[in-house]
Regions:
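N-terminal flexible/basic segments that precede or flank functional cores
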Residues: 1-9, 16, 21
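Residues in the recognition helix of alpha-helical DNA-binding motifs
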Residues: 32, 43, 72
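Recognition helix of helix-turn-helix/homeodomain-like DNA-binding domains
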Residues: 35-48
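Short basic helix-loop element that most often maps to the first helix and adjoining turn
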Residues: 13-32
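DNA major-groove recognition helix of helix-turn-helix/homeodomain DNA-binding modules
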Residues: 54-68
């Protein structure tokens, strides 16, 4: 598929929803996936797009397919 250079794409995620559903703190999730709490905050706010490796670690932590957590819009 070809994309226009003018096309603005963003990633939406369900990290906050899944974390709350699981009763985990930002610190607990951060420790589980090997990042800082500030990184989790930025991901949840949509201010930071995680690397593929981090997205996969988050998906594994929540036992969800990565595409159920992160969506290209």
């Amino acid at each position: 598929m070809l994309y226009s250079l003018h096309m603005q794409e963003t990633i939406q995620n369900k990290v906050y929803t899944l974390r709350m559903r699981n009763g985990a703190t930002q610190e607990e999730l951060a420790n589980a996936v090997g990042v800082t709490r500030q990184t989790i905050i930025a991901i949840e706010k949509g201010n930071y797009t995680p690397s593929v490796l981090l997205a996969l670690k988050i998906a594994r932590h929540f036992q969800q397919p990565v595409e159920k957590i992160f969506t290209l819009v």
